[in-house]
Amino acid sequence: SIMLAFNTNTPMKVCLWRGEIDTIMTPYDSVRYYKYFLRSSFLVEDPHTGYVKAYVGGPDFRYFKWDAVTQQRKQVGSTIKPFLYTVAMQNGYTPCDEVENIPRSFDLPGDSVPWIPRSSGPKDYHGKMVTLKWGLAQSENYISAWLMQMFRPSAVVDLMKRMGMRSFIDPVPSIFLGTSDIKLEEMVGAYSTYANRGVYTRPMYVTRIEDKNGNVVSRFTQQIEEVLSEDQAYLMLDLLQGVVLIGSGNRLRR
């Protein structure tokens, strides 16, 4: 039977972080073993040229034939919030504008009970006036919910599409919680827009292909689009710096 085969010891070669080893284990145990592997990815892009400088798609490709940079989609969590704040900057808001830090409710179709996002920031600031810069720095859901009430979810999705997002993003109020599954390649390209003065540059892996004699077989041109004004990009850089200087990302400075 299948279960008998899956629980029968079998000689096999398995992957370790330090290399390969020959061992004996059941196919069932080998599946469990590989499930314990950390499946992370890493991408570094020059924001001005789009040239990819570093790329890690996952562990050994001989054993994990799946690219976590260009194939894998994951929920992005609060890293999606800057795009909501970008819409606000496009509509005349500034990092210094103040908002009351209180719960916000959303009436959902077919649901008699309104949805109220929970706070994710310091409780001693509840009910106080806080700046948008503070709201993003602390990743406070109350402020993100207020922004979502001010602007349609579809406006955020439209902006993200212009910033290179090709994954499906459902235009619902909970979008600011990062419920959408997005590729790392798309997120890196979108974030690079802020560092490139508002110009989106798609990550570029190959500039040209040559044959063995050095003759150019094919050339590739960069895909760029001006998404934000330089002033809007500057405001967003100021907001993002606040995350590291005074907010939830300050541990990066230690």
List where the protein language model places each region.
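A penicillin-recognizing enzyme superfamily signal
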Residues: S1-D46, Y55, F61-W66, I80, ...
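Active-site SXXK
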Residues: T49-G50, R73-N101, G135, A190-Y194, ...
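Short active-site loop at a secondary-structure junction
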Residues: V31-S40, Y63-F83, C96-N101, M129-V130, ...
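Conserved catalytic neighborhood of penicillin-recognizing serine enzymes
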Residues: Y93-S154, Y200, K212-L237, Q241-G242
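Proteins synthesized as precursors that undergo proteolytic processing into mature forms
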Residues: F61-Y63, K74, M89, P95-C96, ...
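Mid-domain, small-residue-enriched loop/turn segments at the edges of structured enzyme/sensor domains
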Residues: V113-S119, R152-G189, G198, R202-Y205
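Structural recognition of the beta-strand scaffold that forms the well-ordered cores
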Residues: S41-E45, K53-Y55, D97-E100, W134, ...
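C-terminal substrate/ligand-recognition segments
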Residues: Y33-V52, I80-T86, Q90, Y125-M150
